[in-house]
Amino acid sequence: MGELFRSEEMTLAQLFLQSEAAYCCVSELGELGKVQFRDLNPDVNVFQRKFVNEVRRCEEMDRKLRFVEKEIKKANIPIMDTGENPEVPFPRDMIDLEANFEKIENELKEINTNQEALKRNFLELTELKFILRKTQQFFDEMADPDLLEESSSLLEPSEMGRGAPLRLGFVAGVINRERIPTFERMLWRVCRGNVFLRQAEIENPLEDPVTGDYVHKSVFIIFFQGDQLKNRVKKICEGFRASLYPCPETPQERKEMASGVNTRIDDLQMVLNQTEDHRQRVLQAAAKNIRVWFIKVRKMKAIYHTLNLCNIDVTQKCLSAEVWCPVADLDSIQFALRRGTEHSGSTVPSILNRMQTNQTPPTYNKTNKFTCGFQNIVDAYGIGTYREINPAPYTIITFPFLFAVMFGDFGHGILMTLIAIWMVLRESRILSQKSDNEMFSTVFSGRYIILLMGLFSTYTGLIYNDCFSKSLNMFGSSWSVRPMFSKANWSDELLKTTPLLQLDPAEAGVFGGPYPFGIDPIWNIANNKLAFLNSFKMKMSVILGIIHMLFGVMLSLLNHIYFKKPLNIYLGFIPEMIFMSSLFGYLVILIFYKWTAYDAHTSKEAPSPLIHFINMFLFSYGDTSNKMLYRGQKGIQCFLVVVALLCVPWMLVAKPLVLRHQYLRRKHLGTHNFGGIRVGNGPTEEDAEIIQHDQLSTHSEEGEEPTEDEVFDFADTVVYQAIHTIEYCLGCISNTASYLRLWALSLAHAQLSEVLWTMVIHTGLSVRSLAGGFGLVFIFAAFATLTVAILLVMEGLSAFLHALRLHWIEFQNKFYTGTGFKFLPFSFDPIREGKFDD
């Protein structure tokens, strides 16, 4: 469990790989996923590195596979994913893969080109078929005497007078249906009404050969007279992207052409079907293997990209690399290198040599599917400094608990728990589906967080005795109204004249003692319910907040002890602990003291702890209306304030002065501190001892002692310490007030829940009729929808964000610097999971 509370111990190691074994060794390290390679060629351009040609070849293969995948998805063919993890191909297998992918790509491109040409030809023949079919009725109307009257404007009056025969030219074609109105207006205006347009809709939509979309089109025929109008009409048709087709003038010719067109369409349809069948066979065969091909190609690309980070000696026979790796995994790394050397057939073993360094290692926190979500919450604020206390284990409990304090409702907690349990039970099936829905994936990745939030909300809901704004009467009430009639002389007249009556717990038998669990359900119907609950939740918020912050300060002690910084303990932790305990810890003691020192008989005389706490800072003790809580309170409070004030210069001045004294003393003695690094020629054996990173000088914000290369700046140290002291002292006040959001959001959630019940469910239950019974079905559906949308989703998200704030700011800033950088090992896991980002 030690690795859960601190990041893993890391070491910098040097790898020496034979050129013929480097590829296989890096492949095995990728399968292991425990080493992070450093770039040893930062000044070398990406395009000038050793294996850039291999990377380009892999990118070209990846491009071809993406093209094939696009065609598979376009054909709605499911891609088979068996979860197989194929081995990395050898470099010599790249030629076969390239040839295979080239063949598939060329075959698909050829099929697509031929299919597009066939579909274009098929579209033209289909349009011509409809033109021949639709225009027959247009020509039949030419023989109608009424047409002569409609088209009389096409003839000159002199020609009409001479009785010249009616000879009109025409063009026929097909146009998109939505362009017909604009097309008709354009013809009318340009030709000044001297054309006659007839159009008819094609019932079935036609497939566009380029896009594959189905388009609704119409057949048209335009009658005109003269070459000038003919040219205008053709230009307009061209502008509207209308397809023009030759149409014979005689019925016999049209009939013969239609017969030939139908025959060609049938033949073409047969060819198209055969082409589509062949395309489907090619794509289905590719769909079975494309996932494996993707993994192979991207593994190869990742390996060559990693090899580009290595140095190559002048003989071109050896590659050297520097890697960060966990100390606990050194044996498994050695075994992986040995396995890679054997696969390559090399006889020279690869060497792993631990190095001495003063560089800060990356932070690596081991996680599993349960702790991963909580670790992500911490890392979102900042990656932990190397080997400092990891807040994630404590967040597992405190985060869902503080969320539940704000969200506490038994009914809502049960719903949230059921949703989380569903995701947990079906996690294997959901993971195998690899959903692309980003919102669902985010919620699913936090399923264990939601589960704990639901369980804790159920618990706090029982404490509040709140279930969908109603109380559960599990043990009966501890209050009784009967003694008030016998001992307090309540009468029927008093009940009639007084709208509100208050039970007196001082009367014997009225209050039977504390409720067995949670809050007495009688408070749900009391008029002063809010006053009682607000007092309870406000004090509870302050108590939880101060305990949470004190725990954070105590965790800083573990950091100081681990990093061997006694100065930070005596001049940092101790005054911080005393300052917070003497002021805000005392406030918690006052609250508990009042709860225990006053009972129902003396509660009327109980003073306000808040007023006493304010007067404590003002040194104001002249108010006789607010009597002292205990004997000697004035002296103790004055002493605590003085102690807290003394802690301020203790934190502000002492540390810079001590650091300056130590610096001058070392300078006088001529000694230097090298941050714990041993100077000299260290061992180069594989099992050589490495420097303990716990003793390294880490760049923290604690003002540590200067190293050999640093110059002590007293002014900077004073300024930094002043900022830290002011931030801590003011933060204690503001952070304590910030925890009042626990009370505020809990109140808001309870009030929203009550409003929803009153405005929706209560309305449905008030209708005492058969219609009301049927209407209650729809009312309950609306209530359920609003409960999930508003109280579970919106209110849940609000409480989640506030819980984040309390952990990131109020809790973690007491001990967590978060200035490290994450350990990013070279691993094939993202490739196997389908996350192909470079």
From Swiss-Prot:
Topological domains, Vacuolar: 408-409, 472-535, 595-639, 751-771
Annotated membrane topology: Multi-pass membrane protein
Main location group: membrane
Role summary: Subunit of the V0 complex of vacuolar(H+)-ATPase (V-ATPase), a multisubunit enzyme composed of a peripheral complex (V1) that hydrolyzes ATP and a membrane integral complex (V0) that translocates protons. V-ATPase is responsible for acidifying and maintaining the pH of intracellular compartments and in some cell types, is targeted to the plasma membrane, where it is responsible for acidifying the extracellular environment. Required for assembly and activity of the vacuolar ATPase.
GO molecular function per UniProt: ATPase binding; proton-transporting ATPase activity, rotational mechanism
Keyword field: Cytoplasmic vesicle, Hydrogen ion transport, Ion transport, Membrane, Synapse, Transmembrane, Transmembrane helix, Transport
A biological process term (GO) from this entry: vacuolar acidification
Cross-referenced Pfam families: V_ATPase_I
All ranges on the Cytoplasmic side of the membrane: 1-388, 427-441, 556-573, 660-725, 811-838
UniProt tissue specificity: Detected in brain (at protein level). Highest expression in brain, intermediate levels in kidney, and relatively low levels in bone and liver.
Record's subunit section: V-ATPase is a heteromultimeric enzyme made up of two complexes: the ATP-hydrolytic V1 complex and the proton translocation V0 complex. The V1 complex consists of three catalytic AB heterodimers that form a heterohexamer, three peripheral stalks each consisting of EG heterodimers, one central rotor including subunits D and F, and the regulatory subunits C and H. The proton translocation complex V0 consists of the proton transport subunit a, a ring of proteolipid subunits c9c'', rotary subunit d, subunits e and f, and two accessory subunits.
UniProt protein name: V-type proton ATPase 116 kDa subunit a 1
Transmembrane domains' residue ranges: 389-407, 410-426, 442-471, 536-555, 574-594, 640-659, 726-750, 772-810
Family: Belongs to the V-ATPase 116 kDa subunit family.
Keyword Ribosomal protein: no
InterPro entries: V-ATPase_116kDa_su, V-type_ATPase_116kDa_su_euka
The keyword Transmembrane helix is assigned to this record: yes
Subcellular location as annotated: Cytoplasmic vesicle, Clathrin-coated vesicle membrane; Cytoplasmic vesicle, Secretory vesicle, Synaptic vesicle membrane; Melanosome
GO cellular component: clathrin-coated vesicle membrane; melanosome; plasma membrane; synaptic vesicle membrane; vacuolar proton-transporting V-type ATPase complex; vacuolar proton-transporting V-type ATPase, V0 domain
